[in-house]
């Protein structure tokens, strides 16, 4: 309902339209799932030896596992290596590549000629392999150290050289490869800038648009394009800096920080703020600084220009802090990298580029919005009221984290009815044109959809519940603490059952979507028929919950874990972010 209402409003205003919204499973290819597994250092046992001017690197490969020849890469510092000497492998058709790949089974040795090296010269060896059953590992790096080897006469003096194999990398490993590989910083930033542009068309960034629009509108009808650009750019800088700094905090604090921001008191304050902003847009009251303050700012800041920039920067920072509840795959990948390494500079830079990419459409929207603002007449009021409804929609996004699904669904229905009713009245007052007919059609569709959504919520609830009685998922076993979890896990394994652990919080919208749409589905219930369902409530920042987060290395919610019959978490099985029932059922069948 909320997406339909928002989309219809945007069509009426002809400002922008949202791209199709994918669920977290659009990034599912970044994470592999495999029921039986070995750790990467067990699947591919690494060893090396230096024989004079040759470095021989060897891998003992477990049965039913293999390494890709084209994924071997060596980067040396204070040394120079020649072209690697590979043995002949086997050609394999692999779903992750467009053409057959040469792979190695059981054991492989690769020889690197050492053209020149110093004592303790370092060489980073990177490799990547898969299991026949379907699990593929991210690229893995080992560091080896060399003894001194004198350079040949025809060798040019160089401090650093690299020998690498060419070949495509499957999409599953692209993000990990960007951060762990040796691409230039500029290339990494460009990639994440592009990812950010894609994220700009998701619900995470939706609240930014009405906020930025309100800032542009607040500058008056005579705002210039350059002024609109500067305001939009400053706003985006505030947002980008917030995401970058927040990312570093989240990487170290995990869900604790996210939970603090989602405390009911803070959410309630945000709801009030956006509701008041909506009233301002409706013209119910004026929001401005006291006249004495305005006079001082006018005198010091040349009619508030500097003050406005600072205010816009702060608004962008606050917006980035409170209006992005989603945990996306690119953001999660960067945060995991920061948390597991000491390379904060690269992590911060990648986060900033990602955030800046998210801001590019915002800047374009701010400029376009400034141009499209009516110079005079009744349409100015219609635009302001429209953004008022958008402010209410943002407030509702926070409300749904505090109340039941049924209550929020009814509120969405009412908001849609009120919004489209207002547009109906305004459209009736306009002159008869082709555009009026088109607007009327969109308005009636919006009214009908809003009414049906509310009807289905109120009167369809009973039949919906009744229809799912026999398909209700097993009752979750509530886990109190880590000791309780270990006991319940052991008890489940003793019964020959695997375990699924749902980590959720009351403020987590996607957690509620799992509960409403995914868990009750027949496919999911059948796929987890021999699995004990456990649940950990991370709503509050208690010492017990912090221990859970640290023990399981939780970055965001929802997170769902799977444990095998030996009580170990299944490699690559974690689900982060909402997943639809069919995809979740397939995921469960693949790993259990």
UniProtKB/Swiss-Prot annotation:
Q: Signal peptide location in the record?
A: 1-19
Topology with respect to the bilayer: Multi-pass membrane protein
Cell membrane as a keyword of this entry, yes or no, is: yes
**Which cell locations does it reside in?**
Cell inner membrane
| Alphabetical list of Pfam families matching this protein | DsbD_N, DsbD_TM, Thioredoxin_7
What InterPro entries does this protein's entry cite? Cyt_c_assmbl_TM_dom, DsbD_gamma, DsbDN, DsbDN_sf, Thiol_diS_interchange_DbsD, Thioredoxin-like_sf, Thioredoxin_CS, Thioredoxin_domain
Keywords linked to the UniProt accession? Cell inner membrane, Cell membrane, Cytochrome c-type biogenesis, Disulfide bond, Electron transport, Membrane, NAD, Oxidoreductase, Redox-active center, Signal, Transmembrane, Transmembrane helix, Transport
Quote the protein name from its UniProt record. Thiol:disulfide interchange protein DsbD
């Amino acid at each position: 309902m909320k997406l339909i209402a928002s989309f219809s409003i945007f069509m009426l205003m002809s400002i922008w339209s949202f791209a199709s919204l994918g669920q977290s499973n659009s990034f599912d290819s970044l994470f592999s799932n495999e029921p039986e597994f070995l750790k990467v250092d067990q699947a591919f046992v690494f060893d090396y030896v230096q024989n004079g001017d040759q470095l021989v690197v060897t891998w003992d490969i477990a049965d039913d596992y293999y390494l890709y020849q084209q994924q071997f890469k060596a980067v040396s510092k204070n040394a120079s290596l020649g072209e690697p000497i590979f043995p002949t492998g086997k050609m394999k058709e692999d779903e992750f590549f467009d053409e057959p790949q040469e792979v190695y089974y059981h054991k492989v040795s690769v020889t690197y000629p050492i053209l020149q090296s110093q004592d303790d010269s370092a060489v980073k060896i990177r490799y990547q392999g898969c299991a026949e059953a379907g699990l593929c590992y991210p690229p893995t790096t080992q560091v080896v150290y060399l003894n001194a080897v004198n350079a040949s006469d025809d060798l040019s003096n160089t401090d650093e050289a690299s020998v690498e194999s060419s070949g495509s990398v499957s999409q599953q490993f692209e993000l990990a490869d960007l951060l762990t590989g040796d691409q230039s910083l500029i290339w990494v930033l460009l990639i994440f800038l592009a990812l950010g542009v894609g994220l700009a068309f998701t619900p995470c960034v939706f609240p930014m648009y009405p906020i930025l629009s309100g800032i542009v509108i607040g500058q008056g009808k005579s705002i210039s394009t350059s002024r609109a650009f500067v305001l939009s750019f400053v706003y985006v800088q505030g947002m980008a800096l917030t995401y970058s700094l927040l990312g570093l905090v989240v990487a170290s604090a995990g869900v604790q920080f996210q939970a603090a921001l989602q405390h009911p008191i803070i959410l309630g304050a945000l709801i009030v703020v956006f509701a008041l902003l909506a009233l301002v847009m409706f013209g119910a009251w004026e929001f401005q600084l006291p006249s004495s303050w305005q006079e001082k700012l006018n005198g010091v800041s040349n009619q508030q220009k500097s003050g406005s920039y600072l205010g816009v920067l702060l608004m962008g920072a606050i917006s980035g802090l409170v209006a992005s509840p989603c945990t996306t795959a690119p953001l999660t990948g960067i945060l995991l990298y920061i948390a597991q390494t000491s390379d904060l500079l690269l992590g911060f830079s990648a986060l900033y580029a990602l955030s800046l990419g998210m801001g590019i459409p915002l800047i374009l929207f701010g400029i376009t919005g400034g141009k499209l603002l009516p110079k005079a007449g009744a349409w100015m009021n219609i635009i302001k009221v429209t953004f008022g409804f958008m402010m209410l929609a943002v407030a509702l996004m926070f409300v749904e984290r505090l109340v039941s699904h049924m209550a929020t669904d009814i509120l969405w229905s009412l908001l849609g009815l009120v919004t489209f009713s207002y547009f109906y009245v305004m459209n009736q007052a306009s002159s008869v044109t082709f555009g009026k007919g088109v607007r009327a059609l969109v308005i009636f569709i919006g009214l009908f959809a809003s009414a049906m959504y509310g009807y289905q919520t109120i009167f369809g609830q009973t039949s919906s519940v009744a229809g799912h009685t026999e398909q209700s998922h097993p009752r979750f076993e509530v886990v109190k603490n880590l000791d309780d979890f270990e006991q319940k896990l052991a008890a489940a394994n003793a019964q020959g059952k695997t375990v699924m652990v749902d980590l959720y919080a009351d403020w987590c919208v996607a957690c509620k979507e799992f509960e409403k749409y995914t868990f009750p589905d027949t496919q999911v219930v059948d796929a987890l028929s021999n699995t004990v369902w456990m649940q950990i409530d991370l709503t509050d920042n208690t010492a017990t919950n912090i221990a859970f987060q640290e023990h399981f290395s939780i970055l965001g919610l929802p997170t769902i874990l799977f444990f095998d019959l030996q009580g170990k978490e299944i490699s690559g099985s974690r689900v982060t972010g909402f997943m639809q029932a069919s995809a979740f059922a397939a995921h469960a069948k693949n790993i259990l």
